[in-house]
């Protein structure tokens, strides 16, 4: 299952293999957890948004479930996590890549990802709208609008 903000994103998610899409606008976490998991919650919640979505992830996970987050850059009350026995994994790939001590282990992984992308086995989701580097403010506004489906690309 994946949560999306509109039908266009739901279609894209299904094209990528999601077996169920949940339009979260106007639907509470409790509502979709009850509907799709018989009120048990999800074993694993993968959060790529962060912010308030991380709090929603705590709510969507089952007791003793796992949350994986790649975008946590804010402060959160972890009480719901502790009271439900959740495990939280926060991954900051940029920090790992930027650390010179990790270059020996990161380089082969990035090369493998590049190979998979070149062979068509890994298909990055890139939004149709691209921006020139001079238009970075417009690109950021577009990103913040929630409209993009995939990554927003800046070009020189």
Regions found by a protein language model. Give the residues of each.
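Helix-to-beta-strand junctions that scaffold the AdoMet/dcAdoMet cofactor pocket
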Residues: 61-62
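C-terminal substrate-binding/catalytic core of Rossmann-like NAD(P)-dependent dehydrogenases/reductases
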Residues: 80-128
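Glycine-centered, small-residue-biased loops immediately flanking beta-strands
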Residues: 65
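C-terminal capping/lid region of NAD(P)-dependent oxidoreductase domains
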Residues: 119-125, 137-156
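Terminal peptide-recognition signature
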Residues: 13, 45, 57, 113, ...
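Adenosine-nucleotide cofactor-binding segment
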Residues: 1-52
